From Swiss-Prot:
Molecular function terms, GO-annotated: ATP binding; CCA tRNA nucleotidyltransferase activity; CCACCA tRNA nucleotidyltransferase activity; metal ion binding; protein homodimerization activity; tRNA binding
UniProt-listed SUPFAM superfamilies: Nucleotidyltransferase (SSF81301), Poly A polymerase C-terminal region-like (SSF81891)
Species name: Mus musculus (Mouse)
Subcellular location: Mitochondrion; Cytoplasm; Nucleus
Protein name: CCA tRNA nucleotidyltransferase 1, mitochondrial
Annotated InterPro entries: Bact_CCA-adding_enz_type3_sf, NT_sf, PolA_pol_head_dom, PolyA_RNA-bd
Amino acid sequence: MQSVLYPWHRQVLRCSWSRLCLLKRYLFTMKLQSPEFQSLFTEGLKSLTELFAKENHELRIAGGAVRDLLNGVKPQDVDFATTATPTQMKEMFQSAGIRMINNKGEKHGTITARLHEENFEVTTLRIDVTTDGRHAEVEFTTDWQKDAERRDLTINSMFLGFDGTLFDYFNGYADLKNKKVRFVGHAKQRIQEDYLRILRYFRFYGRIVDRPGDHDHETLEAIAENAKGLAGISGERIWVELKKILTGDHVNHLIHLIYDLGVAPHIGLPANANLEEFNKVSKNVEGFSPKPMTLLASLFKVQDDVTKLDLRLKISKEEKNLGLFIVKNRKDLIKATDSSEPLKPYQDFVIDSREPDATARVCELLKYQGEHGLLKEMQQWSVPPFPVSGHDIRKVGISSGKEIGALLQQLREQWKKSGYRMEKDELLSYIKKT
């Protein structure tokens, strides 16, 4: 990569790729030619760029995809920005016989086109006219810098041309290289435009920063002053961000910060959280890719805390059940563990539950408890099928449904005691003895 910084207004300087550029104040530009960038050029993208160029509309890669490419990562999702209005895009795609899908984003300037079996989400440059802390009324523009100004963080405010030219108006590239997470302009203003940006700040801090603790004082002050604004944000949006915080780096530092700055009560977290347990569990799970709820459950003292979280964030049934399971069993299964067969109580739980996700839940509990050796054994263990059915018991002359059920339970207990080794004939002979 080659780079040049242009700090003065409307100066004409020679760029690093040997052509003259007329650039606005503070615009930083450089040339990117990486394998990750080149890999984006599918047949669909080539057709898209050719169409926009033919109609004299500017088109660039925008936001998070640019950040990822500069970090040497191929982005999973690529968003595009353009000077063309939604009406112009629709006319252009219709004339070219290109199908458009999902028109829900049109009022915000987004058109999704399908080319060569790929979807391309293209959004018109825009400025926020009015904001209420959750949504914005937008106005379309052709000014790239104005669009960059409305974005949340400097590292997310860059654009990339298809010749590899980076357009960076707010030192996003420098912040990315220096592992800094900063709001575009004033933190307070950006946050009040959309209070969810508080959680986005924490999320990207966990992705970008090498060592925790380096925060801008103005940013932390703005977060503390505006934390209550998160009370008006939907639980679903909060949970999306919180899950990403919990699966990122520096999670212990960030959760403590969320409590210190008064954010926690507005996002469904308990006021009397068990932060000591959280400190211990965050170390236990490090390097073992826990599910977000596995770590979050350490903050909860009672199962009712999980229920309250669900009411606020609308978590999935699977996530709620995992939280309830961990809070209920995190101590009991440890107490039940026989030192000679430490995995046995966990295996018995899976056998008794007969639920398809029981093994996965137990594995999350073992991560929580820091039982890494048992976790490896559990992951390698295949749940054995219980060899006796009600039909088998009827064959030995027992027809009462109630009696069959009781016998099946007795046989299951004998089978468990044998380490799941007793076979059908052995178990049925046990009936005859009794």
